Amino acid sequence: MQDQGSDAVSMFDRHFLVERADNQSALQEAQRLRHQVFRLERGILPGHAQARLEADEFDHASHHVILRQRRSGQAVGTARLIVGGWQDGRIGGFPMLRYCAPGMLRDLPMGTTAEISRFALSKVRRQGGACMDGLLRYGLMRGILRISLDLGLTHW
């Protein structure tokens, strides 16, 4: 007999697919979904109104995940993993550094540290209730974990 966790994972796998956005077309799909969620649904981030994309200077140093509904192929979630590092002899490359005290991340191994951001779930999918919401978050984190393992990351 399977436990409830295994049943939930099986249900997720039947209905959703986690993909890496590893080309320009997939990246733009993730940016369109971010525009939809962050600008149109929540009104919290500026976006490129003409292109209907939510993009910033950190996208180029990021690995992106797309959560897709299997049946329709529709992207319903996205997140990114920003790979940081040293810039000009100091820690750089993470949006959170804009808000942290200087030196706060000094002890982290920058070569294996990343920041998770732009975690977005479509309003349409969020309406599925707490169970669905949890499964979708699980899916995005599964993608983030897969990328982290592939890159040898040790810290988020």
Language-model regions, residue ranges each:
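Acidic, low-complexity proline/glycine-rich segments
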Residues: 1-3
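Short amphipathic alpha-helix that is part of the acyltransferase structural core
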Residues: 6-56, 64-71, 75
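Residue-level preference for short coil/turn positions at secondary-structure junctions
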Residues: 14, 61, 109-112
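Conserved long hydrophobic alpha-helices within structured protein cores
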Residues: 32-37, 79-81, 111-121
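N-terminal start-of-chain detector that recognizes signal peptides
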Residues: 35-40, 52-53, 85-91, 128-130
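Short, His- and charge-rich active-site/binding loops that engage polyanionic ligands
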Residues: 61, 66-107
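Acyl-donor binding region in acyl/amide transferases
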Residues: 87-88, 92-156
